[in-house]
Amino acid sequence: MKSTNILIVAALAVAVHINSLAQTNAPVTIAATMPAHVNVALIPVPRTGGITNRQTLVLERAKAAPGDYDIEFIGDSITQGWEFVGKNVWNEFYGNRKVINMGVSGDRTEHVLWRLEQGQLDGIKAKVAVVMIGTNNSGKNKDGTDAYTDSDILEGVIAIVNQIRTRQPDTKILLLGIFPRGRGFNPQRGRLLEINQVLAKLDDGKNIFYLDFGSQYVESDGSISKSIMPDALHPNEAGYKIWANAIEPKLKELLGEK
């Protein structure tokens, strides 16, 4: 498996940080008592509580129906929503294709990594994997600090991409930019925009393809209309129609359809 682009992204991030320190003549020091940062976005962990039922269902769904698929959708509640408010659109666009939904509400990158580790993709051979994950990593702690750094989230998404590439080397990955969130523009949405700019660099035109159509959910004044995202996060049927239309041309290309 080739991971050149992923390594380049990581190297560029480090280089930019070091260069910024050099330009300010700031000394680079490491405090002996400073604990090492642990990126929990990279540590596979299962869900707890009531959502474990959905987690188990998704795992068993894949294991109960191995074989060839046209498309697999991997993500959180926004992906899971295809089965509910997005059901009519799903049937319209994917009813004649063999497609599997692997979305679990509330999932963060570490939860998807756990599912992959548990064999989510074992026995599944998909032509295309549509992946969107990371919005649930972008929240705050109770004290108002970021629960995850931008680098944490990026590394978590990249780890998922690498896992899919390892477990399904013939699968094309359609990585989607994380959807905008919040009724008006806000710092969290700004973070996601910056994260998406880096994720775009993973597109190698061969195995990984990046697509960002989040702007289609945003009005000219920067707001997200209740007519497509009632809670400013999850699409309704009209919002899923935007999603389906946005990725359809690329899906046809990757699936070899006319």
Which residue ranges define each predicted feature?
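Short, glycine/acidic-enriched loop or turn micro-motifs at the edges of active sites
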Residues: T79, G106, S215
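Oxyanion-hole/transition-state-stabilizing segment in secreted/luminal serine hydrolases
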Residues: Q80-G95, T109-E155, Q163, L174, ...
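Generic structural signal for well-ordered alpha-helices
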Residues: V157-N162, N196
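Catalytic His-Asp segment of secreted/periplasmic serine-dependent ester chemistry enzymes
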Residues: L12, P180-K258
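N-terminal secretory targeting modules
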Residues: M1-I74, I78-V85, N91-E92, T166, ...
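Structural recognition of the beta-strand scaffold that forms the well-ordered cores
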Residues: D70-G75, K98-G103, K127-I133, N137, ...
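Second-shell loop/turn segments in exported
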Residues: V99-M102, G144-D150, R183-N186, M229-H234
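Proline-centered flexible-loop/turn and helix-kink motifs
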Residues: G95, P169-D170, D204
